[in-house]
Amino acid sequence: MKLIIFTGLVLFAIVSLIEAQAENEKACLPQYQVCTDAPGNCCSDLVCDCYGRYKCGARIGRNCFCLQKGVIYKRED
């Protein structure tokens, strides 16, 4: 009887550990994906870069995207 209880506890511990590891290994966001609500989820070679949106000089929002580190984007007319 003690062996059955011990085996059950060990299996429960293993399942709990597997579930905890699965939560920590969430998929990262690829390049150009929106990261406004999840700034830390971009893949390792990317950074969550945010830009303010303005209309008539007033800020109306913010957009964030996973972009390459060290790359500067400039507006083209």
Swiss-Prot record:
GO terms for molecular function: toxin activity. The keyword Glycoprotein does not apply. Residues 21-26 form a propeptide. InterPro entries: Spider_toxin_CSTX_knottin (IPR019553). Contains 4 disulfide bonds. GO terms for cellular component: extracellular region. It is found in: Secreted. The keyword Ribonucleoprotein does not apply. Residues 1-20 form the signal peptide. Keywords: Disulfide bond, Secreted, Signal, Toxin. Expressed by the venom gland. It comes from the Eukaryota. Its main location: secreted. Belongs to the neurotoxin 19 (CSTX) family. 08 (U8-Lctx) subfamily. This is U8-lycotoxin-Ls1r.
